[in-house]
Amino acid sequence: MLAPVKKTEIISQFRTHDSDTGSPQVQIAILSERIGELTEHFKTHAKDHSSRRGLLKLVSKRRRLLDYLKLHDTDSYRDVIGKLGIRK
């Protein structure tokens, strides 16, 4: 679970305007942070299969948001993947 302070930092870094909290860029950044936290969790709790299912759902949702962003706003897509280091 993301701490509210960390979530606010992510939103301020990726938002497109002052009151932006739900744009694809922000959602992708928040999901990426949650995915990173779960990945660290699995280094010590390898047999936590219910959380692994949640991780796969988060990865799938992030993938769909990235596909949407790539289709509708290629410049933002490149910017987001560059900042997060998700893909080539």
Curated annotation (Swiss-Prot):
Q: Does the keyword Chaperone apply?
A: no
UniProt keyword list: Ribonucleoprotein, Ribosomal protein, RNA-binding, rRNA-binding
SUPFAM superfamilies (alphabetical) = S15/NS1 RNA-binding domain
Can you name one GO molecular function term for this protein? structural constituent of ribosome
Question: Which InterPro entries does the entry link to?
Answer: Ribosomal_uS15 (IPR000589), Ribosomal_uS15_bac-type (IPR005290), uS15_NS1_RNA-bd_sf (IPR009068)
Q: Name one GO biological process term.
A: translation
Cellular component annotations (GO), alphabetically ordered? cytosolic small ribosomal subunit
User: Is the Ribonucleoprotein keyword given for this protein?
Assistant: yes
The protein's matches in PROSITE patterns, at most eight in alphabetical order, are given as: RIBOSOMAL_S15
Subunit details for this protein?
Part of the 30S ribosomal subunit. Forms a bridge to the 50S subunit in the 70S ribosome, contacting the 23S rRNA.
Recorded hits in NCBIfam families, A to Z, give:
S15_bact
Q: Which family does it belong to?
A: Belongs to the universal ribosomal protein uS15 family.
Which function does this protein serve? One of the primary rRNA binding proteins, it binds directly to 16S rRNA where it helps nucleate assembly of the platform of the 30S subunit by binding and bridging several RNA helices of the 16S rRNA.
Q: What is this protein called?
A: Small ribosomal subunit protein uS15
Q: Which organism is it from?
A: Acidobacterium capsulatum (strain ATCC 51196 / DSM 11244 / BCRC 80197 / JCM 7670 / NBRC 15755 / NCIMB 13165 / 161)
